[in-house]
Amino acid sequence: MIDPQLREGNSVARLLARMNREAKDAGVPARRIHLVFAIDRLLARLLVSAPADSWVVKGGFANQLRRPDDARFTQDIDLRIAGTIDTAPMLVADAFGTDLDDLFSYGSPAPPTPLEGPPGGGLRFLAVAQVAGSELVRFKIDISASDALVGPQESHLSDPVLTAVGYPRSSFPVYPVAQSIAEKVHALTLPRDRENSRARDLVDLVWFAERFSVSSSELIDAAVATFAIRADHPWPPSLSTPPASWAKPYARLRTEVGLVPETPDDAIAAVSTFLAPVFAGARGLRWDPTAVAWS
């Protein structure tokens, strides 16, 4: 149930005023809050329209659910589905067609496009979120099938900003930390025909290492499964020196999420320390982000 006052008078103006106030107080662009709401309310629909355990949040938005105050902001949503990729259009259509009486509605102006990479195939949908019939924001929904998923899913609540504006928080299924790290390791080390431009993968790995305790055994299991199903380069991989072109994007993202390493070279050194026992297959250890060490 949303705050009844949001339904009084001009509901669009009232909701936008509240969201924009929260954005101003947080010192972030209003679009950021609009996206958080649009993605959250879509996921809330999936909780109703799709069977339990048929989907899970992964990627950047999973990290925002874990730590909304300092995760790298993402402008889209990544989902892994339990079924085959051909079931994704119906999953999305059912969510779009679910009415939660929350002022939001969803549609798409174009058919989905294929994604390269996911072992079971992937589709990208363009979602248009509307509030009381007026467009609020657009965002991408990337859906993959058959990605490795080792270990129990986590459950995380909506961003607290939902409550501040007058909406209930939901609890969403989220990729395990170890699986999220394994996918980042795979993305960072993936051989490419051109220069790797994904400085964000390095940023995310440092972010994980500075904030989460994780078992080396869980990381090894998740990584081995990920590399096996992707089958594009062997496990364990090697870490390369970051390209010089990463200096500016790394500096910007470092400021956004609050990382210790000052440069990409410092960051890759930190990641090397974090991953060395994992690459070596050393089980039974636990990472301590405060001590920055395994024990």
Name every feature range the model reports, one short phrase each.
Residues 1-55, 65-295:
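Structured mid-to-C-terminal alpha-helical surface segments
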Residues 57-61:
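Glycine-rich beta-strand-to-loop/alpha-helix junction loops that act as flexible
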